[in-house]
């Protein structure tokens, strides 16, 4: 995932000294690591590595010690695109990538710049892109629907590779023998049911893909092939259905499955020793092993790979130094734990993920006292071993987190979904502070890493204990299991001796509530433990979900059930709690759901729950099933006031939803989405020091970016504060407990922070920046200061080096909006974007467009149509200039992202001023019409090619 913007370059025009981290714009903070899909070492420069990750595309120039994002010119769900990344072995600066909408991209400068080749496939059709060794410009696509495709023009076009591959069978992996590039092996993606027509899993070609023959089959279906590696002496190794297979004749026939416990049924990656035929490295769910007898037996190589609960990182990529084994260096890509390096042929490992921002952070909490300022960040949605919980330290509010480390000693979790600090235990410092974390442990078959998903630390996160006594058990051997535990709250008056009123000052607190998937009883068709309660600080738990609807028609396709997600507690009367639920049902079997779902309230400490959802939007055709409630927030000063977010998850892309508000304890709800353009709100947060200040984060995509929103009036109106934020926004929010101007967000690329600067008109440009604009801060010369006009924003242009520059070096531009239809009175996130960040904009003459003043980006709230003037102070645009737009040609469609001519909707009305006509849901806006907002990015540009005929 790439950041949506490059820089807000105006802050230094009015500030002296170094800027605080995230001042006025979102800044990446770490922690680092995460899912690695592809990993390559440059054959020409072994210190250069490339990684395709869930967080995007990264390069290292120092052997993996540090990593830098390399995405200039890329767009289209790059976290997905990391699956399809390749390097040209003969031209090591040439890379290819298939983005999330199926477009082939190429870089010829080591990833510094990317451009489309012009070829595309359907979204998610490409599982792998493979360079053909022995020549430049030849590569292959491994597809879901069309077998193996081959290109001889560096990705500009592809054709079918040859005959013999089964029609309609998805392929997942292709390996080419570097010693004989005509010999190739293709593996299928896997099938989980009987398919007697297609039982072969690996296909061999000895003529460069002109023809194929099946060489490895099963009794009744094709299996899943995740890796194939050619070795010395005709040996080939393959990971097939999580098992190891070996061929002694170059893939013509196979032996297997090989190996016994613990590596059977756990293998994802193989890498043959290029010099020793019987030696192979084996990676998978149990870490890394090496076999020296052709896969008959193996030895674990997990020193340094243990990440949590005694479990090693799951290895899905094994990369060797080009001169291995003379240079005994190896790198590993893992499922959830980033990249590891060994200088000793795997004898020991060290993490090498600094800068690799691909951690999926779903939970945040902060501790502060005079000696310690610490952030806890939980890794979400992991089903393989991950660090699970990180702790970071900084020098104080707004300063960068200079160090992150796992905080998971004895923590039996693979993922963390909530972190809660007991405030009554803070007085003794971090070392005696009690923390709770919830999430999920290892799934089956990781029998040695299963527990109930609730954890407690008595020493500030230094060590952890699982606290799941009383939870239902399953499995063999039995272990506590209630699925994912998503949220946990504390009763603030549940200490041993509570005061007459108000929260306890000393603790620890004893009454805890949590929400989880719960336990389904197949015999009775009932669910329990969706709400959990403990009265002894987590030492034991009881089910507390009476009144939460039981499944309907539990044994039929018409089954309906509810999942309990958020929970909040009334701090003034802790007997009162609220939960939000999400409905599960088969839309193909039911015309409309009938189960009660939405918000429920308990007034007796969770003993009973009552439906409390009047006014929340319902599923189509339903009277009782509200849209999915994914977050809740309560006003600590007035607990009758709550907010919730609802999303229609039954529709792909969460096409409808928003924020709702109640002032009577949930008896009635009304929409509170004024200013919210995102429909998929995943987090709500009330600033505890200013309960009228709220934050919300909305998910999105590159072509319809998500945002973080702020309301200063209790949710009556919202505005975006999203400059620099990743396109898919955030799933966790945290206000700094010392300085509420500092806000943190958890995303799929780690933690991001922003230090909010005064911005009276909420247009995204700090007041001090607008006050320094031309004409004494009146950039549009209308007699009113720009800093006081929500529809006017003035700031300096972006700089090439990414550093803020004074106005003497980077002159100002001004955005001013005139409504045509709709209110169109509020500009948001007005910013400058460095044009080259989007890659080359190539004219019809083959040369690049030049952007002397870079790009202007802004969003207009509550708007159907508007005129926008862009005044670039001091500029003089000749007749050779036109207006260019970067964004989707079809609003919201990532497949149409790119550079476009916008001159038909733009007029130059003065030497330095352009006037744009913009319409909601039309060309020139990222947003689809349903957003009722216009998001534009573009600027004046000139192609030198227009002068070639001798005319201006």
Residue ranges of predicted features:
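Short coil-to-beta transitions that initiate beta-strands within beta-rich domains
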Residues: 28-42, 71-88, 118-132, 164-177, ...
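Residue-level detector of Asp-centered blade-edge/turn motifs that repeat once per structural unit
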Residues: 43-46, 87-92, 131-136, 178-180, ...
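Residue-level signature of beta-propeller blades and closely related beta-rich strand-turn architectures
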Residues: 55, 101, 145, 190-191, ...
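A short loop-to-beta-strand structural motif that recurs across blades of beta-propeller domains
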Residues: 56-59, 103-106, 147-150, 200-204, ...
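Glycine-aliphatic tripeptides that mark coil-to-beta-strand junctions in extracellular
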Residues: 93, 182, 328, 433, ...
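Blade-level signature of beta-propeller repeat domains, shared across WD40, Kelch, NHL, RCC1
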Residues: 728-758
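Extracellular calcium-associated, cysteine-rich motifs in secreted modular proteins
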Residues: 755-808, 944-952
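Proteolytic processing hotspots in large secreted/extracellular or virion-associated proteins
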Residues: 838-890
């Amino acid at each position: 995932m790439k950041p949506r913007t490059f820089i807000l370059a105006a802050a230094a025009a009015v500030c002296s000294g170094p800027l605080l981290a995230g001042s006025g714009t979102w800044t990446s903070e770490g922690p680092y690591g995460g899912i690695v899909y592809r990993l390559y070492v440059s054959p020409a420069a072994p210190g250069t590595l490339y990684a395709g990750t869930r967080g995007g595309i990264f390069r290292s120039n120092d052997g993996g010690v540090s990593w830098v994002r390399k995405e200039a010119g890329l767009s289209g769900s790059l976290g997905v695109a990391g699956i399809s990344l390749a390097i040209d072995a003969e031209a090591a600066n040439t890379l290819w990538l298939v983005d999330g909408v199926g477009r082939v991209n190429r870089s010829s400068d080591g990833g510094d710049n990317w451009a489309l080749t012009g070829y595309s496939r359907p979204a998610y059709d490409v599982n792998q892109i493979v360079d053909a060794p022995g020549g430049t410009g030849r590569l292959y696509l491994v597809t879901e629907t069309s077998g193996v495709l081959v290109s001889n023009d560096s990705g500009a076009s592809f054709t079918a590779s040859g005959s013999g591959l089964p029609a309609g069978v998805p392929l997942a992996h292709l390996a080419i023998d570097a010693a004989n590039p005509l010999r190739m092996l293709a593996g299928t993606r896997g099938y989980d049911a009987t398919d007697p027509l297609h039982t072969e899993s690996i296909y061999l070609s000895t003529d460069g893909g002109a023809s194929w023959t099946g060489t490895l089959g099963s009794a009744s279906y094709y299996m899943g092939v995740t890796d194939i590696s050619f070795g010395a002496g005709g040996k080939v190794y393959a990971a097939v259905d999580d098992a190891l297979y070996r061929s002694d004749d170059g893939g013509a026939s196979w032996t297997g499955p090989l190996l016994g416990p613990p590596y059977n049924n756990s293998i994802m990656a193989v890498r043959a020793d290029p010099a020793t035929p019987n030696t192979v490295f084996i990676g998978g769910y149990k870490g890394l092993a090496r076999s020296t007898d052709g896969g008959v037996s193996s030895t674990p190589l997990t020193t340094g790979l243990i990440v949590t609960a005694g479990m090693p990182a799951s290895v899905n990529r094994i990369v060797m130094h080009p001169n291995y084994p003379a240079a005994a260096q190896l790198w590993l890509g893992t499922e959830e734990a980033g990249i590891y390096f060994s200088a000793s042929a795997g004898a020991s490992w060290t993490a090498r993920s600094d800068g690799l921002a691909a951690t999926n952070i779903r939970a945040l909490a902060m501790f502060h006292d005079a000696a310690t300022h610490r952030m806890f960040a939980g890794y979400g949605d992991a089903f393989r071993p991950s660090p699970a919980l990180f702790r970071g330290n900084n020098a104080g509010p707004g300063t960068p987190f200079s160090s992150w480390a796992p905080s998971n000693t004895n923590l039996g979790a693979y993922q963390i979904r909530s972190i809660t600090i007991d405030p009554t235990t803070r007085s003794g410092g971090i070392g005696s502070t009690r923390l709770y974390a919830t999430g999920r442990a290892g799934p089956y078959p990781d029998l040695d890493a299963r527990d109930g998903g609730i954890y407690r630390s008595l020493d500030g996160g230094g060590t952890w204990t699982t606290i799941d006594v009383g939870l239902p058990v399953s499995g063999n051997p039995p272990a506590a299991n209630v699925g994912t535990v998503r949220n946990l709250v504390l009763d603030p008056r549940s200490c041993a001796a509570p005061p007459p009123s108000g929260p306890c000052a000393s603790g620890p607190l004893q009454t805890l509530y949590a929400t989880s998937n719960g336990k389904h009883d197949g015999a009775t068709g009932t669910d329990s433990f969706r709400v959990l309660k403990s009265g002894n600080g987590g030492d034991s738990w009881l089910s507390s979900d009476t009144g939460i609807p039981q499944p309907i028609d539990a044994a039929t396709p018409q089954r309906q059930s509810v999942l309990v997600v958020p929970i909040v507690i009334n701090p003034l009367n802790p007997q009162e709690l609220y939960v939000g639920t999400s409905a599960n049902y088969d839309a193909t079997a039911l015309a409309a759901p009938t189960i009660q779902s939405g918000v429920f309230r308990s007034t007796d400490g969770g003993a009973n729950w009552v439906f409390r959802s009047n006014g929340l939007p319902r599923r189509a055709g339903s009277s009782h099933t509200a849209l999915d409630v994914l977050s809740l927030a309560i006003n600590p000063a007035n607990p009758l006031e709550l907010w919730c977010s609802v999303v229609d998850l039954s529709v792909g892309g969460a096409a409808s939803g928003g924020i709702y508000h109640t002032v009577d304890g949930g008896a009635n709800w009304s929409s509170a989405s004024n200013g919210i353009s995102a429909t998929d709100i995943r987090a709500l947060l009330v600033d505890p020091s200013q309960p009228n200040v709220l934050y919300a984060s909305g998910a999105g995509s590159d072509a319809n970016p998500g945002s973080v929103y702020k309301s200063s009036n209790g949710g009556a109106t919202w505005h975006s504060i999203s400059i620099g934020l990743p396109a898919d926004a955030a799933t966790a929010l945290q206000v700094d407990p010392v300085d509420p101007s500092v806000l943190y967000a958890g995303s799929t690329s780690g933690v991001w922070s922003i230090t909010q600067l005064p911005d009276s008109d909420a247009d995204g440009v700090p007041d001090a920046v607008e006050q320094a604009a031309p004409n004494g801060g009146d950039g549009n010369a209308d007699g009113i200061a720009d800093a006081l006009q929500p529809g006017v924003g003035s700031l300096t242009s972006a700089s090439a080096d990414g550093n803020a520059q004074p106005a003497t070096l980077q002159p100002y531009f001004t955005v001013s909006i005139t409504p045509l239809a709709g209110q169109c009175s509020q500009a948001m996130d007005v910013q400058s974007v460095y044009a080259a960040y989007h890659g080359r904009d190539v004219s019809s003459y083959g040369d690049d467009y030049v952007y002397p003043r870079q790009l202007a980006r802004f969003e207009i709230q509550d708007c159907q149509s508007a005129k926008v003037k862009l005044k670039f102070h001091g500029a003089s645009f000749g007749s050779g200039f036109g207006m260019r737009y970067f964004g989707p040609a079809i609003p919201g469609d990532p497949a149409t992202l790119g550079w476009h001519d916008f001159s038909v909707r733009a007029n130059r009305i003065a030497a330095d001023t352009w006037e744009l006509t913009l319409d909601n849901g039309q060309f020139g806006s990222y947003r689809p019409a349903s957003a009722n907002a216009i998001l534009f990015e573009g600027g004046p540009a000139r192609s030198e090619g227009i002068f070639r005929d001798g005319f201006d």
